Amino acid sequence: MNKILAIAVLCFWIFNFAEAGTYKDRKYTFKSLSNLGSVIKKGDPTDFKELKFIRKSEGKEFLSTSGRPNRENLSGKRKTYLYDAYVFHAIYNSGHKINFFVDTDYAKNSEKAEKLALSYAKTIGQIPLFLREGSPNLYNIVREKSMGIRKIIIAKGNNRWWADPILNQFFIYPQHSGVTKKSDTIIMHEASHLSLDTKLLQDDVWIQAIIDDQMNITKYAIQSFGEDVAETISFWVAVRCTDRKGIKKKILKAIPNRINALDKFVKDNKLSTSPMVCG
């Protein structure tokens, strides 16, 4: 399918969603990503190497923009604010480094901050490498080489996690009422915004898969094409990188074309899934 037709299809879906203003005319298989559960086990291999404490800031040194309030209707705005943080560097086997900023309003001491950073750093080491570290064959929205996750802010509040692909960072809100303790699937969701979205959304095979499936994997995936990618990636991992036979059948029945399109995309772009073995 040529690029013009692909763009036309994208515009058509966006227009229809804006006009409908509701989910009732859209089909989806799972109500939310949490219905998938965790796809990574505690003892699974990890590319995480070490966590280094760097320092604790003072005087409200850092400026950032919060996630939106966690509301069913997605209302509310992000707020820019100043904060202090315990700063850590997580190092992975490839040498990739992620800066962790643990807000002092959430972690009241360095021990709690380190425990939080270490927990998430280990989980991030278990997800596919191309989500964590990007790839020379992927690029972001300003056409620069995808660098994957470079910074994570662990903050206080029942807010929505959100990713900023320009800054290669995302927010983690452990107090978010809809997030499970393991959080591996939502980590992959946010990581996909930093590494995968831009190039995949211009892929003709992926666009055709959206048309052919006539189904979204979750209710939230209907929000936008970027959210469709981000929601789908964890289900692809469940199908191709784990032994969860029961749920595989349900996923493949719902979005077989997207799963196959991701297979091709990962292979064609030589994307590493380390430490997971996917196929």
What are these regions (language model features)?
Residues 171-187:
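Short pre-active-site segment immediately N-terminal to the catalytic Zn-binding motif
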Residues 50-168:
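Auxiliary, metal-adjacent structural segments of Zn-dependent hydrolase domains
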Residues 1-20:
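Classical Sec-dependent N-terminal signal peptides that target proteins to the secretory pathway
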Residues 209-279:
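Metalloprotease/metallohydrolase-associated module, dominated by Zn2+-dependent proteases
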Residues 184-199, 230:
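Active-site recognition of the HExxH zinc-binding catalytic motif
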